[in-house]
């Protein structure tokens, strides 16, 4: 066996093993997304999310898993069987994925101000129509969860919730905010979130009285709530994690470039046989 043949054989099995790993990973992602979609009780109780946005994300996971499996399968079969057509298709899909990521990165960088303004408009619109439109429930619950995770309230400040029609108080009452703004660390009491994500509520921390309606959990703005807006919290999160985000993006990009280089090198250096399927007929 010549040095070139040994190199091609090494590249072939290297591509096969790594794509087999990603095929298994895609299968796990697909199974995980399907499990979330099917399991409406125990998993939701564990995560603390309402089922509507969780169902949306589970579909995204399932589709991502299927696409990962399909791409990895092309790489596995194309490399192992030395099929130029599959290797070429594998290279083309990786190139399309890489170009899409580069395009998105450029658009986000150049249109950052416009994107921030658009996100602000969407958030403020969601706040203003909070619990008034059943079709927007998923977006509202997702924003509730964002406030809970980022430990913030409103976009610029909790005063943004004064525009919410369903939370507007009478002139004699103080303003209300959703329970997702509740700062449980101030009282070491997190049971308010049982009302936010589920229909039952056992108790709430001191000084925080609930305004209970059909499916709204709200508490006075003077209670123990987060005082920082989510715009500031999001900027802090991005600043603290920018190195990790850039590192992950660079790692994924380099991995895709490596697979593209190996696949096109293997494809170009195979014997000039354009249809290896004939041997299996």
UniProtKB/Swiss-Prot annotation:
It is a multi-pass membrane protein. The chain crosses the membrane at residues 18-38, 60-74, 86-111, 242-266. This is Leukocyte antigen CD37. The gene is Cd37. It comes from the Eukaryota. Keywords: Cell membrane, Glycoprotein, Membrane, Transmembrane, Transmembrane helix. Interacts with SCIMP. Interacts with SOCS3. Interacts with DECTIN1/CLEC7A. Belongs to the tetraspanin (TM4SF) family. It comes from Mus musculus (Mouse). Glycans are attached at residues 170, 183, 188. GO terms for biological process: defense response to protozoan; negative regulation of myeloid dendritic cell activation; negative regulation of T cell proliferation; positive regulation of immunoglobulin production; regulation of defense response to virus; regulation of humoral immune response; T cell proliferation. Residues 1-17, 75-85, 267-281 are cytoplasmic. Tyrosine phosphorylated; leading to activation of downstream signaling pathways. Residues 39-59, 112-241 are extracellular. PROSITE patterns: TM4_1. The keyword Ribosomal protein does not apply. Structural component of specialized membrane microdomains known as tetraspanin-enriched microdomains (TERMs), which act as platforms for receptor clustering and signaling. Participates thereby in diverse biological functions such as cell signal transduction, adhesion, migration and protein trafficking. Upon ligand binding, two signaling pathways are activated, one acting through phosphorylation by LYN leading to cell death or a survival pathway with activation of GSK3B. Plays an essential role for clustering of integrin ITGA4/ITGB1 and promotes its mobility in the plasma membrane of B-cells. InterPro entries: Tetraspanin/Peripherin (IPR018499), Tetraspanin_animals (IPR000301), Tetraspanin_CS (IPR018503), Tetraspanin_EC2_sf (IPR008952).
